[in-house]
């Protein structure tokens, strides 16, 4: 029986993963080693019961008594806190879903790779902050990383069986978010509610706002660089409002291989769960005649400066990605709290990168996770200062 763990089980990716696992037979088909979640204890306990999980972990120690009570008599072990989540990753599983949002997902993902099994990576911050270290850890342990972002899953599939030396360019698509047709002045004055109203995808607040600012796409450009190893000048993003084409790969013979799929994360999750084969996934099928047209345009970097900043990070490499991600997370916190404006987020990130670029760690290829965490901490402090100054100017 195949074993699995789901980190971030109660988030949107975790819920979709749980749904697919249950459709494939649940506890009759899989041995669930570990499930982790946040404060939604009721849902975490429901999942643990349904999958007969060996271990359930909440990220918050104060929620542990409630989890213990909810799973009393089931035989499922319970634990709480960040250290408990990291230790859960030390339990070997054939297939692990890494879906914890933000830099918090880095530690369990790294530890899971050391078993030499398969890591389905939905946590893009892991590749952005520590891509070179992550990929090296996978190689050294004979582990496989499968991308779960719809764009990177699409690139992965388009490259199957291909000679990467013949790849001329990789194009990932962006919906453009809710502001794709807004003027710069209108974007500058947008509210949190407007920023989180995504036109195509059903997502959480933070990732929806990241999509609106195109910071999500900026992270994905860096992720493409780290996962597939292509030079920055061969990686680009285009705005594709229909969200049907997820990525394209251009080859040296002039051919362009495109991957089309529904705007449903279960497609990419299902591919990772069924890999190296394919299996039934309950998503809508594409009717090209009904769609009628697919459109593409280049993004406006004046309105969406995150893309320009991403190219700087792709060129610098080292731990610049860790600084970029940390600054982005702090800037997003301040925007959601109403302390800075929407366009101030990019300014905070740019000022943070400039401020920490003189640190020896900035351009260094990390040898250990501690270096990644040190740069993350340094950049967060710098970003807090930059955001504070922006707030004073409002």
UniProtKB/Swiss-Prot annotation:
Entry annotated with the keyword Nuclease: no
Matching InterPro entries: DXP_reductoisomerase (IPR003821), DXP_reductoisomerase_C (IPR013644), DXP_reductoisomerase_N (IPR013512), DXPR_C (IPR026877), DXPR_C_sf (IPR036169), NAD(P)-bd_dom_sf (IPR036291)
Pfam families from the UniProt entry: DXP_redisom_C, DXP_reductoisom, DXPR_C
EC numbers for this chain: 1.1.1.267
Needed cofactors: Mg(2+); Mn(2+)
Residues annotated to bind NADPH: 10-13, 38-40, 123, 125, 204
Pathway named in the protein's UniProt entry: Isoprenoid biosynthesis; isopentenyl diphosphate biosynthesis via DXP pathway; isopentenyl diphosphate from 1-deoxy-D-xylulose 5-phosphate: step 1/6
GO-annotated molecular function: 1-deoxy-D-xylulose-5-phosphate reductoisomerase activity; manganese ion binding; NADPH binding
Reactions that this protein is recorded to catalyse: 2-C-methyl-D-erythritol 4-phosphate + NADP(+) = 1-deoxy-D-xylulose 5-phosphate + NADPH + H(+)
Keywords per UniProt: Isoprene biosynthesis, Manganese, Metal-binding, NADP, Oxidoreductase
Binding locations of 1-deoxy-D-xylulose 5-phosphate: 124, 150-151, 175, 198, 211, 216-217, 220
Highest taxon of source: Bacteria
Gene Ontology biological-process entries: isopentenyl diphosphate biosynthetic process, methylerythritol 4-phosphate pathway involved in terpenoid biosynthetic process
TM regions (residue ranges): none
Record: residues binding Mn(2+): 149, 151, 220
Broadest EC class assigned to this enzyme: oxidoreductase
HAMAP family: DXP_reductoisom (MF_00183)
Family designation: Belongs to the DXR family.
Physiological role: Catalyzes the NADPH-dependent rearrangement and reduction of 1-deoxy-D-xylulose-5-phosphate (DXP) to 2-C-methyl-D-erythritol 4-phosphate (MEP).
Protein name, as recorded: 1-deoxy-D-xylulose 5-phosphate reductoisomerase
Lineage: Bacteria, Pseudomonadati, Pseudomonadota, Alphaproteobacteria, Rhodobacterales
